[in-house]
């Protein structure tokens, strides 16, 4: 099982999460919280929707982790490289944060 496969399998088991096609048209399924997509894959990388407020709150932590990059300054998303188990754990940790940040934002 690749790190990306492991992330999707374990992410889909998080409370309140379902797996469904991405609204962005990526091939693997995405992770959804209600009607809000909170994570999707790009081969061996995962984009996680932390929200802009969440990204600002975690700025120092995110900047200190070389595996993580911000998509764009005005984006709700960060991208995490998935190379091994530690990366999968980090991506799942950020996905749990995304769940908390996205509750009540269209994520019914």
Where are the regions that the model predicts?
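Charge-dense, helix-prone N-terminal extensions
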Residues: 1-108
């Amino acid at each position: 099982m690749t790190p990306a496969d492991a992330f999707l399998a374990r992410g889909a088991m998080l409370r309140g999460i379902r797996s469904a096609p991405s609204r962005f048209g990526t091939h693997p399924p995405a992770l959804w919280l209600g009607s809000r997509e909170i994570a999707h894959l790009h081969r061996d990388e995962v984009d996680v929707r932390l929200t802009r407020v969440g990204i600002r709150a975690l700025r120092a932590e995110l900047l200190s982790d070389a595996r993580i990059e911000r998509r764009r300054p005005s984006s709700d998303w960060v991208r995490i490289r998935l190379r091994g188990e530690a990366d999968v754990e980090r991506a799942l940790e950020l996905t749990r944060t995304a769940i908390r940040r996205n509750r009540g934002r269209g994520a019914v």
